[in-house]
């Protein structure tokens, strides 16, 4: 009878079993990834690929999904520009329709276009005024944090804020010393 160590048992029995379980888990995850990408892409071609091709295709697909999010974030960061572009496209469309409509009064078209231009200008001025007010408010908030409010007796000069108010000094009493 031959004596077998735990290491030999592990190498003969456990290690192959653990490797089979690991491969089965990997294959299950690859199948899940394959079906998920096929559903999201709307393309069943990935289902017929081998594992390496499927992984490459999944990586490419995920990179493509990552790119539009950056574009969407840039669009969200500039809503006013998006609005301006949309408004101008609408104005151009109105102008085109009025020009191509037979029997359209020139005076009516002129007044409509003047009105649309005036509204656009008012919107721009409102946005600029609001931006300026926000800027002023932010700068005032920052500058007022550093300084104490001026008293009514203050002259209003900057030097009033820098110098601390003179504090009354207590009367010095002679200090008792034992010698």
Swiss-Prot record:
Chain segments carrying region Disordered: 146-179
Outcome of mutating residue 141 to V: In strain: NVIII-m19
CDD domains: bHLH-O_ESM5_like
Outcome reported for the amino acid change (mutating residue 114 to I): In strain: NVIII-2, NVIII-5 and NVIII-m15
Every Orange domain range: 83-116
GO cellular component, one term: nucleus
Biological process annotations from GO: compound eye development; dendrite morphogenesis; mesoderm development; negative regulation of gene expression; regulation of neurogenesis; sensory organ precursor cell fate determination
GO MF term list: DNA-binding transcription repressor activity, RNA polymerase II-specific; protein heterodimerization activity; protein homodimerization activity; RNA polymerase II cis-regulatory region sequence-specific DNA binding; sequence-specific DNA binding
Record InterPro entries: bHLH_dom, HES_HEY, HLH_DNA-bd_sf, Orange_dom
Keywords annotated in UniProt: Developmental protein, Differentiation, DNA-binding, Neurogenesis, Nucleus, Repressor, Transcription, Transcription regulation
Subcellular location(s) of the protein: Nucleus
Gene3D superfamilies associated with the record: Helix-loop-helix DNA-binding domain
Entry keyword annotation includes Oxidoreductase: no
Primary residence: nucleus
Domain (bHLH): residue spans on this chain: 10-65
Chain ranges for the short sequence motif WRPW motif as given in the UniProt record: 176-179
Keyword Transcription found: yes
Quaternary structure note: Homodimer. Heterodimers with dpn. Transcription repression requires formation of a complex with a corepressor protein (Groucho).
Domain commentary: The orange domain and the basic helix-loop-helix motif mediate repression of specific transcriptional activators, such as basic helix-loop-helix protein dimers. The C-terminal WRPW motif is a transcriptional repression domain necessary for the interaction with Groucho, a transcriptional corepressor recruited to specific target DNA by Hairy-related proteins.
Function: Participates in the control of cell fate choice by uncommitted neuroectodermal cells in the embryo. Transcriptional repressor. Binds DNA on N-box motifs: 5'-CACNAG-3'. Part of the Notch signaling pathway.
Name of this protein: Enhancer of split m8 protein
């Amino acid at each position: 009878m031959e004596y077998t160590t735990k290491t030999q048992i592990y190498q003969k029995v456990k290690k192959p079993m653990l490797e089979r379980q690991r491969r089965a888990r990997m294959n299950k995850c690859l199948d899940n990834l394959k079906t998920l990408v096929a559903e999201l892409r709307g393309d069943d071609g990935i289902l017929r690929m081998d594992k390496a091709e499927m992984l490459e295709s999944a990586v490419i697909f995920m990179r493509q999904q990552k790119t539009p999010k950056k574009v969407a974030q840039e669009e969200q960061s500039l809503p006013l520009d998006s609005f301006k572009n949309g408004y101008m496209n609408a104005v151009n469309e109105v102008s085109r329709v009025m020009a191509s409509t037979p029997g359209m009064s020139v005076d009516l078209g002129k007044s409509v276009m003047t009105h649309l231009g005036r509204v656009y200008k008012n919107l721009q001025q409102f946005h600029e005024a609001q931006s300026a007010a926000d800027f002023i408010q932010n700068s005032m908030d920052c500058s007022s944090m550093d300084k104490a409010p001026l008293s009514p007796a203050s002259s209003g000069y900057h030097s009033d804020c820098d110098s601390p108010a003179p504090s009354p000094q207590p009367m010095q009493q002679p200090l008792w010393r034992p010698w």
